Amino acid sequence: MSLGEPGGEGGCTTHNYLEEAYPWPERLTALGLHDGARFRDRFPVTEYVQGDACALPFADCAFDVVHSNAVIEHVGRRDRQEALVREALRVGRRVFVTTPNRWFPVEVHTRLPLVHWLPEPLAHRAYDLARMPWAKQNHLLGPSGLRALFPGPVRIDNLWLSLVAST
């Protein structure tokens, strides 16, 4: 089985759980925005490709499974999120997309309660005051927003803190 993973070089320890646990790491392909040096040091038998998850550099149906773990909220607004889903569906026979649940009261990136529910200008001001200006770039999704990104049938599992979309 071949498995592609957009967002393969994250700074968070949970980002690489697949590479750490999958029994056949030589069958994985990870994709990230960075040059992949840290990733290659940690996972030398897993292929790493530098690229954009919204414009994947792979052929149609190149992978049995595409798994995107908490990437979609970082790619930009809706048009970019739709592009990520479209590309994942193009290159993978099955697709799994996870994302933090917008309707969970504590935002997982900042660990701030309720701020992400404020109107955007107020939330952005709160992120600045909390010295987390990077959080303004996150575009969180709820179950209906995640479902709307998929052009066809998709299963959405609400795990309370996070959502999983699977085809």
Role assignments for model-derived ranges:
Residues 2-55:
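Class I SAM-dependent methyltransferase SAM/SAH-binding core
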Residues 67:
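A conserved beta-strand element that flanks and buttresses the S-adenosyl-L-methionine
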Residues 75-92, 99:
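A short, conserved alpha-helix within the catalytic core of class I
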Residues 87, 94-121:
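Conserved class I S-adenosyl-L-methionine
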Residues 109-147, 157:
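C-terminal alpha-helical "lid/dimerization" subdomain adjacent to the S-adenosyl-L-methionine
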Residues 152-162:
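Conserved S-adenosyl-L-methionine
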Residues 70-74:
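Short catalytic micro-motifs in class I SAM-dependent methyltransferases
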